Amino acid sequence: MRIANPEIIIDINFLKDVISLENKDNTVEIGPLFRQLELENWSDLKSKLPLVYQSIPYVGQIQHRARGTVLGSICHGDPTSELPLCFLALNGKIYLKSKKGLRSISANDFYLGPLLTSKNSNEVAIKLELPTKKEATGYAFNEVSEKYSDYAIASFAVVTDNKKIRFTLGAIPSKPTVIEWDMKNFKFIDELLNDFAWNLDIEDDQHASATYKRDLIRKVGKNTILSSVKNI
């Protein structure tokens, strides 16, 4: 993308011990060299991470997923990318290591802007932690693009339970954006989505007008919420 010009590139592909996926009791832990296609082909993906299961076919094309890593996508922080959106919707956790030590950051605090995260330049992402499917919880993903596997015009990841709706929007804002609503206000979902759409700073671009994007939030966003509620 020509946004960086590093003087030194370190190849870590030979570090086989970081190509890992560990299925813990309530989380899935993913190592830094675990490829997106490996995650897509994981036999337990649908039962453990249903939101990621729904979203990962939209991630580029199969040759991209064969080479791209899960943590690479998370750390790149492209606002049109699907995996950062799921990371935020699930409020996962990323572990960063440097000479100063190890620290973890929740997804809520990780994205600062387009292609900008709170990872420092002297840190390496060593592990991603995602919470697995919970009882009485619904998950849904949806995306609108000019053609399948193209950059998203709008993407939606929703997690709902009996208490709240966690609505996450990608591509339209400059970074993945999340808002939570009390499930008691579900009957006002049209008004909530309309207010949310108008409170965003949305501009026309070569792909869609601001009016069209707001309409996507209201209509496709609502359909994604309804799908999530249906899955509870």
Language model features by range: what are they?
Residues 1-232:
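C-terminal structural segment of proteins
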